[in-house]
Amino acid sequence: MQFNPRYNSLNPKLYHQQPPSPLRGAKAGHFNEALADELLWNADDKSNWVEICSGQKTFTDFPPLAMVYAGHQFGQWAGQLGDGRGLLIGQILNKHGETIDLHLKGAGSTPYSRMGDGRAVLRSVIREYLAGHALNALGVASSHAVGFTTSTQGVQRETLELGAMLLRTSDCHIRLGHFEWINQYQPDLLSEFAQKCIEWHYPECLEAEQPILAFATKVIQRTAVMIAKWQ
């Protein structure tokens, strides 16, 4: 894999670096070899996929991190949120030269867990894994998953369930909530953060008379198309 670690080049107030908390008794769930090929995983990466997808193995080229963001829940301002059970464990180049995030869900508690245990369960991991594949096949914007693992580790929900982890991919894990958090708590970082987002994801907007407005327009349009395709 060829890494392009750009998110951890941002101001460290925007994230918390930490390793994942590995699952006990990790076992293979399913591995998406076609997607791994798109991401240029080599033979060693593929042979170690269970260790990667269960938090046992990390990449020296990218210290894992949890992102902080804010937002609304149930129509009310919820303040600071953040990656409460997921970690960005890598940013790599795919075979088209595009930067792709590797995000491990169920990786353990973080400073943003808000009393949660930081875990995911097999039931919800399988649902997200299948839903991502279905949405991508239907042409609807969605994350995609390299694979998932299950384990012998119990996780308490309404009943005791099996702990699991999902390694999902996307060209971007930056949310609208990142901008909300920065605007609310670190407004001095807003201009630089927006500039980086434009450079990374919408470089064509740099040529516009008002780059920020052009960027916002692009995001609104793509979001509207995505929501329309949900119907």
Map each language-model feature to its residues.
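ATP-dependent phospho-/nucleotidyl transfer catalytic cores
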Residues: V125, V155-Q231
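Broad phosphate/nucleotide-binding scaffolds in NTP-utilizing and phosphate-metabolizing enzymes
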Residues: M1-I126, L130-L176
